[in-house]
A protein has these predicted regions:
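Conserved G1/Walker A P-loop phosphate-binding module
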Residues: 1-50, 157-164
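Conserved catalytic-core segment of NTP-binding enzymes
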Residues: 82-98, 116-126
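Conserved nucleotide-binding/hydrolysis micro-motifs of P-loop NTPases
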Residues: 17, 41-43, 80-82, 107-112, ...
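Amphipathic alpha-helical transducer elements in NTP-driven molecular machines
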Residues: 18, 53-57, 145-148
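Signal for well-folded cores of large energy- and translation-related assemblies
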Residues: 3, 61-68, 95, 124, ...
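Inter-motif core of Ras-like GTPase G domains
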Residues: 52-80, 92-104
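Canonical P-loop GTPase G-domain recognition
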Residues: 110-164
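Generic structural signal for conserved hydrophobic packing positions in ordered secondary structure
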Residues: 24, 59-60, 87, 123
């Protein structure tokens, strides 16, 4: 969605297929290189063993906590669903680790009218039970390219702010 190159990252209709950390080198408008990193999802890998899920969890935690140059993490949430405990737990953990993050609600085009807003509002209310303020939120659709420009602007802003 971000690059407009459909074949850049392998996708699957089955959640939980990403099993490795994938790095994508990006050349900024200022000609400086930076990396967009795709981590395995933490929620859906129902077809793999508990041991494999634990290994992924440890790998993700280690990556997030030890990356001194990590500028921001994007937590992708399927907008078709109400808040899931695993998502709330992960976000809570990011807060405890003091990792900056934004939430990207995906697949907004797959919902019935009004469902995305209801689900996002429920998610926000759930977070505000524990958080004083909300992280930056984005509503996106890869198919319709909705939210793409807003997300790219946010990434550019982060890059400009944290670029050496």
């Amino acid at each position: 969605m971000l690059t407009g190159q459909q074949r850049l990252a392998k996708t699957s209709s089955t959640p939980g297929k990403t099993q490795l950390i994938n790095h994508f080198e990006v050349l900024g408008t200022d000609k400086k290189k930076w990396y967009l990193v795709d981590l395995p999802g933490y929620g859906y890998a129902a077809t793999v063993s508990q041991k494999a899920r634990n290994n992924w969890g440890n790998m993700i935690e280690s990556y997030i906590r030890k990356r001194e140059n990590l500028v921001s993490l994007f937590v992708l949430i399927d907008s078709r669903h109400l808040p899931q405990a695993i998502d709330i737990d992960f976000i809570r953990q990011l807060g405890e680790w003091q990792v900056p993050f934004s939430i990207i609600f995906t697949k907004t085009d797959k919902n019935k009218p009004g469902a995305t807003i209801r689900n996002v509002e429920t998610f926000k209310k759930t977070l505000l039970q524990e958080w004083q303020s909300l992280p930056t939120l984005f509503l996106t659709s890869a198919e319709k390219k909705e939210g793409r420009e807003e997300l790219l602007f946010h990434i550019r802003s982060l890059h400009e702010t944290f670029s050496p």
